Structure formats: structure tokens, C-alpha cells
Amino acid sequence: FLPMVNKTLHERPDMKWYVFMEADSFILWSTLQQYLATLDPTKAIYAGKQMLIANDMFAHGGSAFIVSRPALRIVVDYYSAHKAEIEKFTDGHWAGDCVLGKTFTDAGVPFTNAWPAFQVDYPGLVQYTRADARPNNQKLRLWCGTPVSYHHMSAAMVEEMWDFEQDWIDRNDPVSNLRSQYRKCSLTESQRSQRRYGTKTFSPPL
């Protein structure tokens, strides 16, 4: 991840925002633009789906994450100044996104948790309750938020979600909220997943 952000800054040094995603990630670009419009690109921002390994908090790479230009410059400069130390740490680690997150922290760039907008899985596997079966905080109810990204998406899922988003954009105001139509699509996918894997979904009323 660190070589990637280093190369990205040198090849595209004048962007306001940098969006990093994996091959099986999916981004709803229309809602990403709305999300970015709520942030200040002149500030050092590193945001995504929160993950934790040991004491290191970081943005999950598969869920995609965003970095402002000031934040990217800070972390690249820090990486250049501490390259040997960071690469030694990397050699003993298994998660490149965690190494990147630790480097942001060490460089003085705080992590911003962008969950539930950035999701760790695809719609049919989005959890409605926590692992202990207690309901999520009402302010963080998954179906009351606007999605930006998903992970573990197959090629067929990506195509279906892309078609859904483009159809929605064609039929609606570009700046309106995807939420109601998204629910229909997501609930359909959730039902498919239940049939496919024989699972039950514990969903709060919409």
C-alpha cells in the first residue's frame, strides 16, 4: 500500500482527493461525490471502514478508502524519511493496509471512520446486528445510511450494481439520495444470499 500511495502522489500530485480500492471493491461514484462534498479537501483526511489490529487503527483496503492531498503529502514525506524503519515493520506484518494506517498515525494524520458508508462486504452480507446479537446504535443503522462502497464483489455483482446506479441516475436528480432505491436493490440481494447460503437476516423495520 505504501509504494502505491507514494507512486500515486508523484504521478498525480494535484488532485483534491485520492480514492484507493481493490479489484473486488465497488464504489457508487455518485454517492462518493456527495460524501466528499461534506469534507474539506484542504485538511489532512484519511478515511474509510475502521479496522483494528493490535493497537493500530486503519482503513480497510478492500472497503476502499479516501485520502486528501495534504494527508497524502504528509504520509509520503514521512515514508521517505523513515523508509528503512517502515519496511522493517512491513516485513513482519501481514496486512499492508494496517501498515499504511499506522504510518498515517505516526505521521500525525488522524483516522476518520467512514463506516457505514464504506462497507466490508457486499449487500447480501451486510450485518444488521452486532456479533453479540444486540442491535446497532440507532444513529448507525445500516439501512438508514447512504452506501459508498462494497467489498468481495464478483464481476456479475459489479455489473448489476453498476447498471442499478446508472439507471437510478438516469431517472432521478443527480444530487438526490440513493437510499430508497438502494434499499430495494439491497434487500433483493439479501434475500438471494439467504437462499444461497441458507442464512437468516435479522433486519430492523425500515
Question: Where do the PLM segments sit?
Answer:
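Active-site-proximal specificity loops/subdomain of glycosyltransferases
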Residues: 1-15
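Generic surface-pattern signal
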Residues: 10, 77-80, 84, 155, ...
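Conserved catalytic core of nucleotide-sugar-dependent glycosyltransferases
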Residues: 17, 25-106, 118
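C-terminal catalytic/acceptor-binding lobe
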Residues: 92, 98, 103-206
